Amino acid sequence: PTIRAWTSETYGRAWDADLYGTVKETFKHDSTWKLPLNWDNVPDGAYRGDRDSSLLLINGGSIVEDKSLTSAGKDGRMYKGLLIRNSEVGQSSVFIDRIMYRYVCGNLQLWGAIYDKRFRRRHVGTNVVRDVIREITTTAQEWTTSDIGQEQRIIDAITSHQLAFTKAGVIDELQKIGFTKKVATDAYERCEQTEPISPFTTWGIVQGLTRLSQDSGYQDQRVALDLQAAKLANRAVEVAA
């Protein structure tokens, strides 16, 4: 006989149908959290590939302000969202990410997003879905009622933090903390092309990175870049604290 899978007695699995079906039922009567609209103005927000899947829930209230946009005469509102991700094939755990974002376009790509907090549940044991749903409801409640003033201070700290004062200096700083030279250079140049804020700032590079992530056709690659951006943003917050 050929063994195709070998698992321990603690092995468990959160199937997409069970996970997202329960999420749907949990939020069915909660108007605070909704699915984003697609190009046809129809609620959407679900993605499923051969390796992973995700569901995006958005909150139209409790906004904070991106002053790099408002100072340039643009809409600087940032909204809150929950991004739930899973992999039935075991490529990753179940993740719940708290995010702030500028907008979701019709093909459900997040623009100007930063990751605020993450929950991770491995595919171990018999209560994976139960544990995840419990965390989602807790996180959604906390995210809805969290301190707007504190969140605004976080955004302000990231927008005011300078990485360096030259292009070469910024790229060098990014390489020191794990970015490749290509990604660092591309993020800098994308910020120059698309953002009103200086690419010398952490916020400028974060926005450059999140725009780069949208170039990828694969969810895992997009998320990897977005998480790099989140780590960079958190670093600026720690420096400012």
Label each PLM-derived region with a short phrase.
Residues P1-K24, P199:
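Feature for intrinsically disordered/low-complexity regulatory segments and propeptides
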